[in-house]
Design a protein with these regions (language model features):
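Short, well-structured N-terminal submotif of metal-dependent ribonuclease cores
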Residues: 1-79, 84-102
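Phosphate- and divalent-cation-binding pockets in alpha/beta enzyme and binding domains
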Residues: 79, 123, 172-173
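Active-site neighborhoods of divalent-metal-dependent phosphate/nucleic-acid chemistry enzymes
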Residues: 2-9, 21, 27-29, 84, ...
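Acidic, glycine-rich loop-and-strand cores that form catalytic or ligand-binding grooves
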Residues: 104-108
Length: 191
């Protein structure tokens, strides 16, 4: 017997609006305020690590990571390792970037790293397919949508809030599944 219930996933997906979603105004979305505050555990989207490494994460994100319990997904590890594989070994900045990514992954506390289960993976694939159809996503955007859906549903199942700068995609996910939670920030320009 599979750990994934196909029929239950289809019943779950009845929320399909059968129409393209519109990005909501920032004022309607949960953004980090100027001051970090306590709250639910957070699950970090891959962009949080990347923005931190590139010096583009606002200071309030670092404060938030100090105040709240931060959790990591194997999805983020996978995306970070994909970046390592994509980097040109001949580029002069690659060695330093790979080293920074390695330190970032090694700094993740093992008891705070979570892998999605078959139910999350199956439902995320279904949700991602719906999102791609509704929004007309193609090629690269489809894989990104799948990873975002896995992270979003994983956070929901674990009772976490996704911390992300990916406002558009996670806004769509919040519209489809309002019981999920995301907290947004805007990456700053690199100095």
């Amino acid at each position: 017997m599979s750990d994934f219930d196909f029929d239950a996933a289809l019943r779950w997906a009845r929320f399909d609006p059968y129409r393209t979603l519109a990005r909501r105004q920032d004022e309607e979305l949960p953004f980090v305020s100027d001051r970090a505050d306590s709250g639910q555990d957070i699950l970090l989207d891959t962009c949080v690590y990347i923005d931190g490494l590139q010096g583009r994460a606002p200071e309030v994100v670092a404060d938030l990571l100090d105040i709240r319990i931060s959790n990591h997904s194997t999805v983020a590890i996978q995306e970070l390792m994909h970046t390592v594989g994509v980097l040109d070994p001949k580029h002069p900045g690659t060695k330093g970037a790979v080293r920074q990514i390695g330190v970032t992954i090694m700094d993740m506390k093992p008891h705070r790293i979570f892998a999605p289960d078959p139910d999350v993976l199956g439902r995320a694939a279904l949700l991602s397919g719906m999102l791609c159809r509704l929004q007309g996503y193609e090629k690269d955007a489809r894989l990104r949508a799948l990873q975002d859906c896995v992270l979003f549903l994983q956070a929901q199942k674990l009772g976490f809030t996704v911390l992300t700068a990916n406002v558009t995609d996670f806004d769509y996910l919040l519209q489809l599944i309002p019981t999920g939670r995301a907290l947004f920030y805007r990456a700053t320009q690199q100095v």
